[in-house]
Every structure is written in structure tokens, then in C-alpha cells.
Amino acid sequence: MGKAAAVGTAVVVAAAVGVAVVLARRRRRRDLELVEGAAAERKRKVAAVIEDVEHALSTPTALLRGISDAMVTEMERGLRGDSHAMVKMLITYVDNLPTGNEQGLFYALDLGGTNFRVLRVQLGGKEKRVVQQQYEEVSIPPHLMVGTSMELFDFIASALSKFVDTEGDDFHLPEGRQRELGFTFSFPVSQTSISSGTLIKWTKGFSINDAVGEDVVSELGKAMERQGLDMKIAALVNDTVGTLAGGRYADNSVVAAIILGTGTNAAYVENANAIPKWTGLLPRSGNMVINTEWGSFKSDKLPLSEFDKAMDFESLNPGEQIYEKLISGMYLGEIVRRILLKLAHDAALFGDVVPSKLEQPFVLRTPDMSAMHHDSSHDLKTVGAKLKDIVGVPDTSLEVRYITSHICDIVAERAARLAAAGIYGVLKKLGRDKMPKDGSKMPRTVIALDGGLYEHYKKFSSCLESTLTDLLGDDVSSSVVTKLANDGSGIGAALLAASHSQYAEID
């Protein structure tokens, strides 16, 4: 009886174990199904967000043509002097661009941020061109960026004076002549001549109240006098106009310059007769360089997504510089961050917890975006490293890395195509967008481009160029060239000092 009971107990235990094993297997299978279901749901949500992003940021060619037309309309409003024009089309008073014949010693001062550059160039005319050039970069102490006008310009003039003192035998100023300077000043000014301009407001971290409303040429001139420096400021220009001048000196077919860097702008050569707001005698050259300030362009045709609208709303200048916020290096990385944040919140892209670093505005910079976008390794190693360092996610799957790279591609492509639409608009304004009606040969047309975004973000620049070719068509695009004018604004200012020299007619 005892043996039978023991056997019975063993059978019951074995049965219980068997049931437990079966139940455990079922539970594991159910848990696995739940995990697989959750993963499938996450993938579905990720795909849905990406589909919405692709749609919101899409730029079909027909839309780009409409944007170009809207750009031309705004340019014409600006040239008429319409007070409500979004694209201001500022008259620069630069009516003579360098020809290559310029000779002599000229200086340039390039002030546009926390550093400034002083440069000198010896020009040798058509044959020798740039004989010699030297430059020096100087950091501006932070306290001078918020001090007084006199303190800032005295510091700049002192550095310029020291630079002049190092002028060697390679540089020659003809007897009895005054040194001349081109002043690149990349802040908003209201110009009344080639060598005068009133500061409208400071940007880029400067806040010097007593300089606002003052003529910056006069302020610099007085500072140079205090240093005992005998130098005439022959030209006041912004960086885009300087790039145009440098581009024209290198290639006589350059008609426009585009800056695509932290910010964006365009300048081009307009027929003076096509500027209704121009008053007084027309320039002898018949031309006038226009500083478009196209970053402020906006139109209901621009594809603004929820990410763009939120970024604009939270910016220091809501409702302003809309075009710039869509295409310039200051903002592209931030747009990518906002899209990744939505994927993290709505689709758990980085897991159940949203990375806290991803919540920080502008933590993802455009150079980091570019590095991820250009990662061609089989495991997208650079993307993984950037997500670890910037977003704080130590281990990311290949799928997450691919999605991140794809978001970079979407944002960069939209920016490049919108930039191409703007360039196409400038070409339309110049009548360089179609073959001549009389059947003559299309003139060679060169666009000088500068800025870190265009120079270093290769997928951006190649997309811009292919989009411009698409907009122009094969016949016209074969005569239109985009050319990198690396660091053209500094030497461009010196060249404009030469072309607007008080001794130009004597030479």
C-alpha cells in the first residue's frame, strides 16, 4: 500500500511538473508574442511618423517653381521700395565690381562675429593679379561686445594699426598716396553711399547701444584717427557683396553671390534702370549691386511643418527670417532634433524613456547632422557614436541608426531644394532662366557660393546643384555654373576698395 501511494504521488508530481512546464511555455510564448506585438506596433508608429514627415517636408518641382515665382515677386516689391516687402533689396552703392585691372596696396577689415580679420593685398593688374596677400585674425574680448562704441572701435583700430606696422617689402604704397580700406560689416545697416552706413541693430551676441543709429564708417574712422592711422575707408559692404566682388575678380561671368552658412543671403548685379526706388543720377556703369537680404523671404508656398512652426515660435525672432530658418546651417540640426524627439515621444524610437538630452534645443548641430548623413559604414558607426555622445543613448540598433540617417536626408534635401529655388528666382529676375528669344547663344552665367554649409555638407551641395539643373532644364543649365568662392568676402572688400579707390581714374 505504501509503495502504491508513493507511485501515485510520483505520478501526480510528474503531471504537475508537466502542466507547469506547459504553462511556462505558454507564458513564454505569450510574452514573446506580446514583445513581438509591441515591436510591431512601435515599427508601425515609427513608419507613420516618418511618412508624415516625408509628406510635410516634400518639395516637388512644381512647388519649387511656385516658390521661385513668389521670390521674384517679393524682389520686385523690394526694388519698388514697398514698405511691406519681405525681401528688402538693399541698394549697396556698389556700381563698379572688380575687373582684374586693379593695381596697388589695399586693406580689408572683416567684422561679422566674435572674431574679426584684417587683410592686405598687393594687386598687380591684369597680368599679375594678386601678387601677395596676408591676413590676421583677432578675437574680440567678450566685454567689448557689450561695452561702448568707442571701446570696440578703438580695439579694432589698434589691431589694424599694429597690422599695418608689419607691412613688409612685398607690399608697396605709391609715394604720396593714402592707404585705403574695404570694410566688411555683417550687421544690418542702412547705407546712403558706398562709404557710409547707419547701424540698424546688432546681432550675433553684440549689444552696444550707443552705436545703434550711428555711421559705422565714421565710428571706425574716428578710432583710426585716435590711433594716428592715416587710412581712408573706401567701401562699406556686407559679406555677401564681398563674396560677389571676389567672385567677379576671379571670373568675369559671375552675376550673383549666395551665402549658405550659419545664415544665408544673396547679392546680385541689377540693371540700374530696373530699380524704381533709385533716386538721382544713374551710375555710369548702368549697374548696381543689390543686397537682397533674402533670408527674410516667406510665402504660403513654403512647406512649413509642425517642427518649423514650433522652432520659429520659440525663437528670438518669431515670424522673421522664415526662409533662413528652412535652409541655413543654424537651424537644420535643430529641425532633425525636433523630428527625432517626436519619434521618441510618439513611437519610442529610443526605448520607453525619452532621452533627456534630446529635449535640449540646439543640442544637435548641423555639423553633427552632416557627419551622420555622410556615414557610409556598414554599421553606421558614426551615427551610433553621435547618438551616444549627443543624445545620450549608449546602444542603438542598426534600425534606429538608419532611421536617424534618413531623417537627416529628408531635412537636408528640403533645405537644398529650397535654396536652389531661391537661386532659380534670382536667375529668373536676371532673365538667365531661359534661352534668348532671338536664338542667340545663352551667355555663361556663374553663381559664386560661399559658406560652411555649401562647402562642407557635400550631400546638401550636390542636391542643390542637381535641383537647379532640373529647374533650368538641360539647355540652359549647361551655361549656368555654381562655383565655390571660398572665403571670398575678405579679399572681396579689399578689391572693392580698389575698384572704388579715390585714385582709380588716375590709374
UniProtKB/Swiss-Prot annotation:
GO cellular component, one term: cytosol
Catalytic activity: a D-hexose + ATP = a D-hexose 6-phosphate + ADP + H(+); D-fructose + ATP = D-fructose 6-phosphate + ADP + H(+); D-glucose + ATP = D-glucose 6-phosphate + ADP + H(+)
EC number(s) reported in the record: 2.7.1.1
Inducers of expression: By glucose or fructose treatment in leaves.
Positions of region (Hexokinase small subdomain): 99-237
Region (Hexokinase large subdomain): 238-487
UniProt GO molecular function: ATP binding; D-glucose binding; fructokinase activity; glucokinase activity
Protein name stated in the entry: Hexokinase-5
Organism of provenance: Oryza sativa subsp. japonica (Rice)
Protein's gene: HXK5
